[in-house]
Amino acid sequence: MNILYGIQGTGNGHITRSRLLIPSLRKKGFNVDVLLSGRKKDEYWDMECFRPYDTKFGITFQVANGTVNKWKTIKKLKLKQFWTDLKSIDSKSYDIIITDYEPISAWAAKKNGILSIGIGHLYSFLYNVPMQNGFFLDKKIMNWFAPVDIPIGLHWHHFGQNILPPVIPQLKGKVTNEDFVVVYLPWENPNLVESVLNKISDKVFYVYGHTSEKIVRDNIIWKPSSRAGFIKDLESCNGVLCNAGFELTSECLSLNKKIMVKPVMSQVEQLANVKALDNLGLATTTNKITTAIVSDWLENNTRNSLPYFNVVDPLIDWIECCLLYTSDAADE
């Protein structure tokens, strides 16, 4: 049985989730081709578990200083390239297409009548979950971006809908609370981040991203992207300051870590995540990063957690049943 698995590459959360699902599908004996889009090939890291995989340009949002730039996003669209990439996929060689909000694979399935399954947090927004008011056009675009036949939404709460818990790794290292804070703000201006954190001189911050090598400046240690290094620090840190992405927030909550999230402004998913976190009382949220706001959060020792659920195994079993049913129906 052949599967095309599309991964939206703009956010590391999509990749983290797929690192769990794709090897599990292959262990079941399925042939899985992997397609990533949304960033340049040399900007991916720790990708061994996906090999072999292909990369395409895809569609992505342009972000500057923590805010989505809609006009720049429109200018950067390469619709001709998207159409070329779409036509290059031999969809008929696949029994099913699975996508984690990756548009090329989703539209290839739709164009060629292949059964498609969407697995990801963004598919939970097709249900009645907390969302910011307004953003009517943005919400329509979200629904159009990577359409599927069967959407499987993931969220921190079911909200009375058919929604699954987060697909996250069960981290097995020793969880401690050492005297440093992990910072992951890839969409923010690094100079602003540094100026804010430098003023909190009695705290040590491990800031991931924005550098290709380790740099120590006063109380800030800049670290290059590394999944293994990041997880090690995540397990032992005293708190996490990050954007309002779904996957990292889920990992923090599973480890009972103190967390402050700042959404990428005008990004509907992250604004919705902030609303959900506020409604559920799971994290401290802020619309801007300032020394006073971060200092107040550091003084607050409130921690919230969510239980870990093994979502991967039953989800893989369900996908296997879908494939067997599809195969039996085709043979009749």
Residues of each region from the PLM?
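Donor-nucleotide binding loops and adjacent catalytic segments primarily
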Residues: 22, 167-239, 291
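Conserved small/polar residues in nucleotide/adenosyl-binding loops
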Residues: 325-331
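A nucleotide-sugar donor-handling region in carbohydrate enzymes
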Residues: 126-189, 207-210
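Conserved nucleotide-sugar donor-binding subdomain of glycosyltransferases
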Residues: 67-96, 101-104
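A donor-sugar binding/catalytic signature common to diverse glycosyltransferases
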Residues: 97-103, 108, 118, 233-272
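Conserved nucleotide-sugar donor-interacting segment of glycosyltransferase catalytic cores
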Residues: 94-139
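Conserved nucleotide-sugar phosphate-binding/catalytic loop shared by glycosyltransferases and other
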Residues: 8-12, 32-79
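Short amphipathic alpha-helix
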Residues: 14-25
